[in-house]
Amino acid sequence: MESDWKKAETIFKKIEQGWIITLVPLDATVQAKVNSWMEWRNFLNEINQKPKSTLGAFQKKAKALTLKSQELNNNIPTEFNTLSIKTRITALITKVKTLDLYIHLNPVPDKKVTGLIAEINDQVVSLQLQMENIVQRNQIPTEEGESDIIKMKDTTRAIH
């Protein structure tokens, strides 16, 4: 019994040390566009609060992150409602669900859990970079007549 407690304590300490979330600040233009996206703000708020006391607190956090990440598909701002953003959200959800799964195993595979934290960080950064990329692309002015050429190239509009 004593060794089970020590193992759990060791696992908790390793997860606590590895639970490092590093979010990159968004560009001011992107930030202004996502301010109204409540689900994104809720997810960031949840992910920024690190559990402190027990392994159970980390398990609750993983469950909460799963719910918040799944909500990211709701109310996506029009500019970001693209396949590239939705794909990154899906990848993020998958990583968070995997974290939730692993942290509830007995014994908890601490190396897997801390590895997933790093992967979740990467997914969030990837999503943020894609948002910035979209904003930058949309700021490039179109050439005169460019929109007509784009319409002509659209094969779904072609008359058959």
Segments the model singles out, each with a brief description of its role:
Residues 40-48, 71, 100, 104:
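Short, charged/polar, low-complexity loop and linker segments
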